[in-house]
């Protein structure tokens, strides 16, 4: 307030008054490490021009041993002290703070939001209700993903299987622990016969996506098969009697489409994040840190350690659009370049053949980039959201083939529409 001189003084010792013992203090799972029996807690006093002092103190209940898991509740009490008056402590001035809120206390003793974006479980505003929300969120995560195994438990389970952990998983186990369901899923996948087990052990990108979504490879395979069949049908219908005369264009579209299908599914697939990302100095480091915090797709489900805000989900749509555009342009250069070489060689061999104009290379590649960035990005984001809803349904959890059948059906409809739409875009742009 203007004209009011503020003097902040931090006292080093708190003298606990007898009135505190009459109030119940909520115990939380908070472990005090290497604390002495007496604890010094800072007191914040604010003195205004009116001469009134307003103090905030924090009282720690040390009635239980600090080595016990349930030891020590934490409460915030507020005193209003007038000049020369005794301290007045009212019941309404006591509020419980969870251990997660303890780290987020600001200079006024308030509880801020310590999460990047929205945690979804009591992340905002202070008070006991936020702590209860966190507890409910933790219970749900433990039910859905299993308990967090400590390093000793992780190594015991791993050695029992005769397996070894990758360096990033090993580091995460030492520092944070690993969810039981993720550990068991990895141990099962890495022991798979053939190329799958080798790929899981050697390729972190595939491993992390398979841990988050065991049906990841099924979706890629379904996408490739469906797209190849649908592209053939759509090309025949759209090109009609010119199909065989334009066969090189069909082959180019098919080859590029196969590569693009893998990119489309892979870039939007959820993946497990081990450890905590660290921000590197400089603009590039901040950009990488911000990218790592984004969800894989707009409708990606939140998982332990992954909370996404509405702004992050919106940013994901545009970021994935840029990535899709880059992939489309690159694949267009390669695919259309091969098709143009085939067409040119064919015309040199059979000069009497009715020639069809060779599509412009850069213009065709740009068409692929724009099409993937706008149309494919939007359609596949929606597909991922629909698959998430179906896979999370009780029926699909009891009967997994239902989710797989839905995946085939929705991707079939998407590919039929997308293939016909691309031919229309190509004709309208003059590329084909």
Curated annotation (Swiss-Prot):
Comp. bias intervals (Gly residues): 111-132
GO aspect biological process, one term: photoperiodism
Upper classification of the organism: Eukaryota, Viridiplantae, Streptophyta, Embryophyta, Tracheophyta
Free-text function comment from the UniProt entry: May play a role in leaf development. Required for leaf mesophyll cell division in the early stages of leaf organogenesis. Acts in a developmental pathway that involves PPT1/CUE1 but does not include ASE2/DOV1.
Keyword Cytoplasm: no
Transmembrane intervals: 249-269, 322-342
Transit peptide: 1-47
Location of the protein in the cell: Plastid, Chloroplast membrane
Region span, Disordered: 109-140
Protein name: Protein RETICULATA, chloroplastic
Any one GO cellular component localisation term in the record: chloroplast envelope
Annotated organism of origin: Arabidopsis thaliana (Mouse-ear cress)
Superkingdom classification of source: Eukaryota
Tissue note: Highly expressed in the vasculature of developing leaf primordia, margins of fully expanded leaves, hydathodes of rosette of cauline leaves, basal region of the lamina, stipules, root tips, stamens and in the abscission zone of the funiculus.
Impact reported for residue 328 to R: In re-3; pale interveinal phenotype
Keywords assigned: Chloroplast, Developmental protein, Membrane, Plastid, Transit peptide, Transmembrane, Transmembrane helix
Chief location bin: plastid
InterPro entries assigned: RETICULATA-related
Family membership: Belongs to the RETICULATA family.
Disruption phenotype: Pale interveinal phenotype due to marked reduction in the density of mesophyll cells in interveinal regions of leaves. Increased sensitivity to ozone and a virulent strain of the bacterial pathogen Pseudomonas syringae pv. maculicola.
Membrane topology annotation: Multi-pass membrane protein
């Amino acid at each position: 307030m203007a004209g009011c001189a503020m003097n902040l003084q931090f006292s080093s010792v708190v003298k606990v008054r007898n009135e505190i013992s009459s109030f119940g203090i909520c115990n939380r799972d908070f472990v005090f490490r290497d604390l002495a029996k007496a604890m010094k807690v800072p007191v914040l006093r604010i003195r205004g021009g009116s001469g009134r002092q307003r103090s905030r103190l924090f009282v720690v209940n040390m009635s239980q041993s600090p080595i016990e898991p349930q030891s020590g509740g934490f409460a915030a009490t507020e005193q209003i002290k007038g000049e020369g008056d005794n301290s007045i402590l009212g019941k309404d001035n006591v509020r419980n703070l969870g251990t997660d809120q303890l780290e987020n206390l600001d200079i006024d003793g308030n509880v801020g939001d310590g999460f990047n974006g929205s945690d979804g479980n009591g992340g905002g505003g202070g008070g006991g209700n936020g702590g209860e929300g966190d507890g409910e969120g933790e219970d749900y995560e433990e039910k859905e993903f299993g308990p967090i195994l400590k390093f000793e438990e992780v190594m015991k389970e791993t050695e029992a299987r005769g397996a070894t952990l990758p360096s990033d998983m090993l580091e995460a186990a030492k520092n944070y622990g690993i969810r039981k369901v993720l550990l068991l899923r990895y141990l099962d996948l890495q022991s798979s016969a053939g190329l799958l087990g080798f790929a899981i052990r050697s390729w972190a990108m595939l491993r992390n996506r398979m841990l988050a979504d065991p049906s990841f490879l099924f979706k890629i395979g379904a996408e490739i098969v469906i797209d190849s069949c649908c592209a053939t049908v759509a090309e025949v219908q759209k090109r009609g009697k010119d199909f065989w005369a334009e066969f090189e264009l069909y082959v180019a579209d098919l080859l590029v489409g196969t590569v693009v299908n893998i990119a489309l599914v892979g870039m939007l697939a959820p993946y497990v994040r081990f450890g905590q990302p660290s921000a590197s100095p400089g603009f590039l480091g901040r950009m990488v840190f911000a990218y790592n915090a984004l969800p894989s797709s707009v409708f990606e489900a939140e998982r332990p350690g992954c909370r996404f805000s509405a702004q992050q989900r919106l940013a994901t749509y545009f970021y994935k659009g840029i990535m899709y555009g880059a992939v489309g342009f690159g694949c267009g250069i390669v695919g259309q370049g091969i098709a143009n070489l085939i067409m040119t060689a064919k015309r040199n061999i059979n000069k009497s053949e009715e020639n069809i104009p060779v599509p412009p290379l850069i213009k065709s590649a740009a068409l692929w980039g724009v099409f993937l960035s706008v149309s494919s990005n939007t359609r596949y984001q929606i597909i991922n959201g629909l698959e998430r809803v179906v896979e999370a349904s009780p029926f699909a959890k009891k009967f997994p083939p239902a989710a797989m059948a839905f995946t085939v059906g929705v991707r079939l409809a998407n590919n039929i529409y997308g293939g016909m739409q691309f031919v229309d875009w190509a004709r309208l742009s003059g590329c084909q």
